[in-house]
């Protein structure tokens, strides 16, 4: 698979934001603001399935107060297996929008083999939500390990999430066709395959049970990595030109050692499963 790329490169706003003719004549105030938000590193341990909330607005609350809508332009999931190359087993990582019920809440399912050591995915959710809804922290990540020969108490995997969000006072029509130039071995699955990978509704019922038990500290914080104003062009704000070193907190996420057959044991080392009708993946 391809090497892991820089977040600032994958989520460069000019790849996602389409400027209108009226935008190019605006001089005084930006019509939109784009922010790259990166999570703390999540260290996975082997103690059963866990569910965490990803707070995308922690460092950009001022924009949530100034604007009406937040647009999720792109999401990058990066992972590093902390194991020898060739170790058997895999991880199932599910991204969810908890505002929705059942299968509709699944934005993407990633199955990543431990043998690959590192993985990275770029997806374009392609929809907006109100800032009021975003403040309720609807985005979640569920993790589970399958057939990994690791003892309890050790950390086999670290994961980081980053997203490009755009704030505006209107729902913007834009192009969301940008994909990774170096494709990290992805393919589109049929609805039947998605159902099989999710264990029909068993996995979703398990996640719903975790929501009821979730503690207030089960939140993966997002930190502002870069910010851009959309005027006549997409321009990085001066205050973010030379950002300081980002503080990284390590949150512990529990992962179970499942006994079921590894669903990623196919031809490709790393696979991306997209919910039918929600996301599209190009090879």
Curated annotation (Swiss-Prot):
Bias type Acidic residues, positions: 270-283
Pfam family, one: MP
Superkingdom: Viruses
Residue numbers spanned by region Disordered: 233-283
Xref: InterPro entries: TMV_movement (IPR001022), Viral_movement (IPR028919)
GO BP annotations listed: transport of virus in host, cell to cell
Presence of the UniProt keyword Aminoacyl-tRNA synthetase in the record: no
Cellular location(s): Host cytoplasm, Host cytoskeleton; Host cell junction, Host plasmodesma
UniProt keywords, alphabetically: Host cell junction, Host cytoplasm, Host cytoskeleton, RNA-binding, Transport, Viral movement protein
GO molecular function annotation: RNA binding
Family label: Belongs to the tobamovirus movement protein family.
Function statement: Transports viral genome to neighboring plant cells directly through plasmosdesmata, without any budding. The movement protein allows efficient cell to cell propagation, by bypassing the host cell wall barrier. Forms a ribonucleoprotein complex with viral RNA. Binds microtubules and modulates microtubule stability. Can bind double-stranded DNA.
This protein's name: Movement protein
């Amino acid at each position: 698979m391809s090497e892991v790329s820089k977040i600032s490169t994958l989520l460069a706003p000019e790849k996602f934001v389409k400027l209108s003719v009226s935008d190019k004549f605006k001089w005084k105030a930006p019509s939109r603001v784009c922010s790259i938000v990166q999570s703390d590193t999540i260290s996975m341990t082997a103690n059963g399935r866990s569910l965490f909330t990803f707070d995308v607005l922690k460092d950009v609350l001022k924009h949530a107060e100034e604007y009406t809508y937040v647009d999720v332009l792109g999401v990058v999931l990066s992972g590093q297996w902390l194991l020898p190359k060739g170790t058997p087993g895999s991880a199932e990582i599910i991204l969810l929008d908890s505002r929705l019920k059942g299968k509709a809440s699944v934005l993407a399912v990633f199955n990543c083999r431990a043998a690959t050591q590192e993985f990275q995915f770029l997806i374009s959710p392609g929809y907006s939500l109100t800032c009021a809804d975003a403040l309720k922290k609807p985005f979640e990540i569920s993790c589970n390990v399958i057939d990994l020969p690791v003892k309890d108490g050790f950390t086999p995997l670290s994961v980081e999430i980053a997203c490009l969000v755009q704030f505006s006072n209107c729902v913007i029509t834009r192009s969301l066709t940008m994909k990774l130039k170096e494709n990290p071995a992805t393919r589109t699955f049929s609805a039947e395959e998605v159902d099989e990978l999710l264990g029909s509704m068993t996995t979703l019922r398990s996640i719903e049970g975790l929501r009821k038990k979730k503690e207030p500290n089960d939140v993966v914080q997002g930190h502002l990595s870069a910010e851009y104003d959309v005027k006549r062009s997409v321009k990085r704000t001066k205050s973010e030109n030379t950002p300081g070193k980002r503080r990284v907190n390590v949150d512990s996420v529990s992962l179970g050692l499942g006994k079921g057959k590894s669903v990623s044991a196919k031809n490709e080392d790393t696979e991306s499963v997209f919910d039918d009708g929600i996301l599209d993946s190009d090879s």
